Amino acid sequence: FERWGTRNHGYLVKKLVDHSEETLIKLVEKDGLLLQYIEVKYRTENIYLHAIRQNPDALQFVAEQTNQMCLECVRKKGVTLRYVQHQQSDICQEALKQEPISIIYCYTPTEEQCQLAVSIDGMVIRCIDNPSQQVRDIAVKQNERAKIYINSPLPTQNQ
């Protein structure tokens, strides 16, 4: 495969005669994104695991995602949270620890998740809709420049 260059890999994978798990694993170990060209009927959990270990973005081509697969991906690359089919709190937490900007891929970020994200990178406040005062305070404490994304104070109960 090396001599063909990366642009032709998808075509070559489709033309493969040997669809053994061993051969397919060798392919995805070279480039995890080749998973997209492997027919679903030949994919196994083992092939999925090798693909996502080589490139966490391969998660987008995994039909049957497990919690463990998703955790492995977001621990390496937080923004792969966007490919997680069934987000759970622990997966979101791990993604945020790795890359706080992945808050934009949380379906419904909790207060705790927002606090975690801004405690690591205060500038992430710009990606949070209607942050609580506590989230704002944490963001500014982490990075003074986060103030530029905090437009106005939260309404008080008297307003």
Q: What positions do the PLM features span?
A:
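Alpha-helical scaffold segments
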Residues: 1-159
